[in-house]
Amino acid sequence: MALTLRVLCPDQNVFDGQADEVILPSTTGQLGVLPGHVSLLTALDVGVLRMRDGNQWTAIALMGGFAEVDDDEVSVLVNAAEPASGINAEEAQKQLSEAEQAWSKFDGQPNSPDKIKAQQAFQKARARLQATKAN
C-alpha cells in the first residue's frame, strides 16, 4: 500500500504520484508519513520534502506552506517548490554563500524588514542546496 502525494504551488503542480514514505519539513521538525498515518494538518517550514519509492529517494525544496495527511493521501500546498533534479548544485552553493554573507551583515542588529528578507533568502538557498544532496 502506497501513499498518494501531491505537491502544489499557486502556479504549478510540482508532483502528483505515489510514494512509500514521505518526510516533511514541518515547523516543529521533520515529520515522517507512512501508509496508515493518522490524519493531520501541519504548517511547513522552508526545507526539503523527501519521498521514497522503493529504495529510491527523491527530494523537493519547499518554500513554506501546509500539508494535509488523510486516508493515505498527502497534499502539500506551498508558496513555491523546486524538484532537486532541476537545481544546479554549484549555483545553489553560490547562492547560499551570497545569502549567508548578506544575512551576516545584520549580526547583532534588531529585526528589520531587510534583515528578515536576508534571513528568508538564506533559508531558501539552504533548502535548495540541501535538496541537491538528499538524493
Curated annotation (Swiss-Prot):
Q: Which Pfam families match?
A: ATP-synt_DE, ATP-synt_DE_N
Report residue spans for region: Disordered.
Answer: 91-122
Does the keyword section mention Ion transport?
Answer: yes
Q: Can you list the GO cellular component terms from the UniProt entry?
A: plasma membrane-derived thylakoid membrane; proton-transporting ATP synthase complex
User: Superkingdom of this entry's organism?
Assistant: Bacteria
Keyword set includes tRNA processing: no
Query: What kind of membrane protein is this, topologically?
Result: Peripheral membrane protein
User: What keywords are annotated for this sequence in UniProt?
Assistant: ATP synthesis, CF(1), Hydrogen ion transport, Ion transport, Membrane, Thylakoid, Transport
An example Gene Ontology molecular-function term: ATP binding
InterPro entries attached to this UniProt entry: ATP_synth_F1_dsu/esu, ATP_synth_F1_dsu/esu_N, ATP_synth_F1_esu_C, ATPsynth_dsu/esu_N
Primary role? Produces ATP from ADP in the presence of a proton gradient across the membrane.
> What family does the Swiss-Prot or TrEMBL record give for this protein?
Belongs to the ATPase epsilon chain family.
Whom does it interact with, and what assembly results? F-type ATPases have 2 components, CF(1) - the catalytic core - and CF(0) - the membrane proton channel. CF(1) has five subunits: alpha(3), beta(3), gamma(1), delta(1), epsilon(1). CF(0) has three main subunits: a, b and c.
Q: What protein is this chain from?
A: ATP synthase epsilon chain
